[in-house]
Amino acid sequence: MGMKESMEISSLTPAMKQYAEVKALHKDCIVLFRMGDFYEIFFEDAVTASKILDITLTSRNKGKEDSIPLCGFPYHASSTYIPKLIEKGFKVAVCEQIEDPKLAKGVVRREVVRIVTPGLVVDTANLHAKENNFLAAVFPLEHHIGLAFLDISTGEFRVSDFQDIRFFETELAALDFREIMVPQGSGKQGFLKAFAGRENSCRLDEFPDEYFDRESALGRLQDYIRKEDLEDLGLKDCPAVIGAAGAVLRYVEETQKSRLTHINRLQWYSAAEYLVLDETAKRNLELFKTIQDNRTAGSLFSVLDETVTAMGGRRLRWWLNYPLVDPEKIKARLAAVAEIRENHLFRENLRKVLSEVYDMERLAGRIALGVANGRDLIALKQSLKNLPVLKNLLADSNSFMLDRIQDGIDELPDLYDLIEKAICDSPPVTLREGGIIKEGYDEERDRLFFMTRDGRRWIAALEEKERKRTGISSLKVGFNNVFGYYIEISKANSALAPEDYVRKQTLVNAERYINQELKEYEATVLNAETRCREREYDLFMQVRECAAAEITRMQATATLLADLDALASLAEVAEKYNYCCPVVDLEDRIEIDVGRHPVVERMSLRDGFVPNDVVLDTDENRFLVITGPNMAGKSTYIRQVALIVLMAQMGSFVPSSRARIGVVDRIFTRIGAADSLIRGQSTFMVEMNEVAQILCHATGRSLVILDEVGRGTSTFDGLSIAWAVAEYLHDKNWIGARTLFATHYHQLTELAVAGTGYRNYNIAVKEWGDRIIFLRKIVPGGTNRSYGIQVARIAGVPEEVIVRAREILDNLEKGEMDEVGMPRIARSRKRKPRNPGQLNLFMSERERVIEELAALNISRVEPHDALNMMLNWQERLKEG
């Protein structure tokens, strides 16, 4: 509670004492304390929350020494405010009133009913529909690291074991966890500290060792997962995994205050089953977010995602995160995609029916968590209604995956019939206001409902009868929550009130009465309304419990529908963008004809996208050196090769006319210069870190794409490093990986002379006088020209600078140097000042630029650095 407030507990009111007790048990949470129709927040929590939620901070006992900081919001707005606290990494304890205040003797009893944390969000309105929200536990033990992670909204629960910390770090980055549990002391380890410091809003908490205790963890696992399934996973010899999984389950039970039936399946996954993509590769290839603005639009996922269900979107994201390495599994996906693609009407109908299916995975989770309302059950019913149609559509399918899906879909007719009979088609959101159960489902509910309805009719009849009896035409019978039913007569007519009328309330212009007849019927009607609402609530809970009993069946079908939607999405994309079905095998050859970049080709390019071929193997075409000017398309080309390989291994068709992909185990990238100045790393250090990761982990089955290695340091250092890296990757005694190496060091083309397996390619350029046109075509052979000056002209560098640069370049190519290596022309050329009368003291910016250019030793400047200088000069010339 942080009571600087150092207020003695004894001095607090009973309600605040109750709050203090709750806060003492949940010190790491912001406590939402239910008081009537509001959640109130006190003390330091209030100060923190008011800033995050942008709500007024006030105080109890304002102006007094014992004032208590206070803020709050209406309970019905919790779905708006709680996510804001969670987004900032806080945990929130929701403390509810658990008895009717009218019946309470003394202070109302309250209890924490759930704890919401970044990794344990159950409100689907506050989750990204097509992304998982994972809570993870990490348990380092001896030479193993156990990892377990759970999405509580779907029940997806996975585990893995790592003996190599670098593979483990790759997994941490891959899954973008929202919250990580570690044993006390483990948070000090470098790998977790580094991870927690990344910009991924991940909460990292240390827990007592008892959470990871093997025996209690195993017992807890056996409570959730069938014994046979646990034995099949072979967890007996994986104590680190058992400890991590048990910690997750204990934390879930403590925060949700119950055992959750939708957590009933544990899945083991191994990095060996998938193409490994580290954080750098995913960023550089822009799989899920663009580098420039961190948006989904413009990423590979945005191109491939034509899913029509949330669960299909999550499945597609998983496939993209974890491409396969088993050709048979890849071929099974490709065959299903091909079958859906081939039949336009089938594909259209399939996607139309799927679009009417709700997120059954998260609906099952809400039912298991006890938070599903009437609308959730109607969404489930609507989804179940479409299952027979889907089964019928898939009845004649030929591919293994579609056949398996068709066989496995459980229509759950019994559950559909129950919801259809019991729940109104348009139920209210809340469960206690009535109107949720259909007429005819329950006799007792109907009796109470009709009594309520008929009672209202009786009231109308009473009003008419009393008007006639009293002769007061303005008499009316009404109702309010405070006084109940009443007979209202205006002040002018109050003298006409019969003797059996008992005054109930006096208003400015009227008197309100009740008589014995109205009093008796009031008790009957009001009691019937209350009992009817209570009966409907009880009936709904029974229906929801029946649905909860079928959670496993729901989840099994939802899993199949997610697969089906992801397959249909890939088929839709393949047809829409004219992709081909790749041949995938275990050979070493990668051969792509007329390949395109799947994202770049979708952009509005004036001249259209220029496709290119590639041949890679582990022999004569092992290492491709690609030279050419900046902006010509080297980076796009090497990226597109990596993306096509990745797409093929996830089971997608690919943007080419023909493709044969020999499976790769990892894709490594070194593209661009992403500074990490926040972490104290220079551009060159980032580059060398990424290169080191590649050289330490690449194998002969890896695909490596490198762009401009060595450019972050001096020319000779950079060239030396680039050359040595190329040799190391090429040499089979070291790595021998299939590699595309884009570089501005044209000297590297000489590698092809030094050994076999190297191939030189360059980007074709058409020269037109002093100008160039990028043809974007990859052609055999190297080039020793960078066209830096022409690129500078395209970039808009002033013509005077371009002309002067051309003069200096001509001089350099003639080798006209003085004894200290400075071009004579650069030092001695006389310039015409633009303003002859201006003194040097007031030299113009344009003249300063030309002066700097004249003094430049161009022999020591590479084209890439020259371009940066020219861009700087251009900015200064524009400003000056």
Curated annotation (Swiss-Prot):
One Gene Ontology term, aspect cellular component: cytosol
Organism encoding this protein: Syntrophus aciditrophicus (strain SB)
CDD domains in alphabetical order: ABC_MutS1
Pfam short name (any one): MutS_IV
InterPro entries tied to this protein: DNA_mismatch_repair_MutS (IPR005748), DNA_mismatch_repair_MutS-lik_N (IPR007695), DNA_mismatch_repair_MutS/MSH (IPR017261), DNA_mismatch_repair_MutS_C (IPR000432), DNA_mismatch_repair_MutS_clamp (IPR007861), DNA_mismatch_repair_MutS_core (IPR007696), DNA_mismatch_repair_MutS_N (IPR016151), DNA_mismatch_repair_MutS_sf (IPR036187)
Similarity field: Belongs to the DNA mismatch repair MutS family.
An MF annotation (GO) of this entry: mismatched DNA binding
Role this protein plays: This protein is involved in the repair of mismatches in DNA. It is possible that it carries out the mismatch recognition step. This protein has a weak ATPase activity.
Residues annotated for ATP binding in this entry: G628, P629, N630, M631, A632, G633, K634, S635
The entry's keywords: ATP-binding, DNA damage, DNA repair, DNA-binding, Nucleotide-binding
GO biological process entries: mismatch repair
Stated name of the protein: DNA mismatch repair protein MutS
